[in-house]
Amino acid sequence: MTEFERMLVNSFNAYIEEKGIRAISYRLKQHRFTSQFLDVLVDSLNPDLYLGIECKSISVEKGASALYFSQHFTVDKKGVHQIKRISDYLNKSGRKGFLAVELRRGAGHGREAYLVPWEELEKKYLTQNLKLTLEEIRSFPEIKRDGKDYRINPSEWERK
């Protein structure tokens, strides 16, 4: 589990506990040679919190200018792209999907994170627009920081 994924799971669970919501956030253990559908899952009877989140982290400090679908996502041994696999899973499970993108800006600079609705990502993939630029990523709702943790507030996640 990456630090970003761990922080999201912990932040979701803190929000759930603070609000007294019957829900849980977790990450499935990844087994060797088996694909993992998503990085973070949130289970709740509340449809707004029945979520599947894929996490990606890119280093802006090292010159990354976009999240590329060919570089940052995988293709399985059957030739199925990760975006297609996750889209199928979200459709079958009924979960609301997001891509959480963390922008690492280097030592002394805070990290930023944004939530891209999965439908937006899938639309770009299907139209062969195979990247998200930093400008596009930053146009989506930010997951704001609270110290070193992320502040979970689904009402803030509406499109800017």
Regions found by a protein language model. Name each.
Residues 5-21, 114-160:
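Helix-rich interaction surfaces within compact, conserved domain-sized segments
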Residues 30, 45, 55-58, 102-104:
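Histidine- and/or cysteine-centered catalytic micro-motif in compact active-site loops
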Residues 1-36, 43-46:
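Acidic-basic catalytic patches of nuclease active cores, encompassing PD-(D/E)XK
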Residues 84-121:
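Nucleic-acid nuclease catalytic cores
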Residues 35-37, 46-52, 81, 92-94:
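Short connector loops at helix/strand junctions that flank enzyme active sites
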Residues 58-85:
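Mg2+/Mn2+-dependent nuclease catalytic core
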Residues 35, 61-64, 107-109:
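Short acidic/glycine-rich loop or secondary-structure boundary segments that cap or lie
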Residues 40-42, 49-62:
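Conserved catalytic cores of phosphodiester-cleaving nucleases, focusing on short active-site segments
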